[in-house]
Amino acid sequence: MDRESKNELWDQWVSETILTDITSPVTPDPVPMVDESGSQLEMTDEYDSYRLGRGNGDYLYLLYVLDEPVSGSSDIIPVYIGETSQVSSRLLDHFRKLRNSLPTSEWKDDGSWGSYGKYDHIATVFEKANSPLYVWVVDVNEIETGPYGYSTYRQELEAKTVGLVHSHPQFNRVFANRDFVPNRVAHEMGKVGPDWVDLENDSPNEEAVVAADNAGDGVSGTSKADLWHEWVEQTIHKEIHDPEGEDPIPLFETDDDLVVELTEVGSSTVLKRSEAIDTRIRQEGKRCVHRTGVKDGPNGLLYVMYQLESDPPSPEQIIPRYIGKAEAYGKKNELSANFEEIAKDRSGTRSFARWGDGSYWHVGELSDTVFGVDSKKLSWASELFEQGTHQLKEQTYLWIRAWDPEKYTGPYGYPAYLAEVEALLIGLAYQTNPHQLLNHHEVPNGAPANQKQFEFDPSST
């Protein structure tokens, strides 16, 4: 049987979930959101009843419009996808903020980041569509599998469905999500405001063009752990075993006892990154940016902080500690502040593709925690360092690459853009190594990283 494309995965999932509820005589769907009959906009009785009928839980929800008459999944047009544990209050908040964003003729670009926000976007669709705005809610625990055919949880399901919608050729201008969507899109939206939404002349974005009719590479894994190990084997493991490569690259400069060297940045004492990782970050960052902006090609860096159970390791012995990304595009300015030092060949490394030694970046925050200045990276300090010291418990490495969906396949075998693949990998790594992974976002609230009481006695030197 031929493998489905990402477009077909979305269409099939919609057919099995939303469309089934819309066409069922025993569900209230479709549920309209806005009552326009009075002097001011109100919630419909159906919407109010629908949201109040649900207690706390694990919910995914979709705001959508319909291309009627509805005959198939392509007639369901997604406007916004979200997840929450408290759907009643979340839907009330969405209605109020939508109402406050109307009419869009009063929108003005105030020059701030995110000036044309998601509620402005949803309001624009509401005004321009020939359909009411509807809502659909599902308890994720009642869904056996996500659209890729594997078990899932609400934070991961949001990322998966957003990724499929953004990669779909039909929904580029109508879809209002900002998370799990490339920063480039928010940047482009902000330049034109409500004129971004053109329901009659939509055209595919570059991610949809890459994904179009691409069935990707088949995966053999029967579990999410299998998928993680397959992806690691094709990337980190492969590069570690490349005799001409430099991986694994230690994150920090250390002595033989794994005591991390220190450096002074202004008045702050900072953990010193290894020269090899600084070179790698600059090298990969240069593939994404030039002096004044972003190059065609990779839109940023994907990174995995990891440790090894053996040297040389098998894929199963490469233990992920943190997964993240640094997008070259900013949401307001084309060039992200995270890449300015790299783009302009500056010697400073304050931001440094998010691995900088400034107080709001990974190494800076970790240094502040290790030396008792702050506690933002408490979980990292507790798990990576011996108490009261700047000595690593184990050697810690960083794999970082300019992410090119046409070079690297996503973990489910399909092309996956940077803002999408980060969350997909976090979901797989969490399933495989839940007690080692230090990501706090895109994992369940009950994940060890979010429940463990981390402690660290700061180093005095």
Kindly give the residue locations of the regions a language model identified.
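Boundary/linker segments flanking structured domains
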Residues: 1-79, 84-321, 325-461
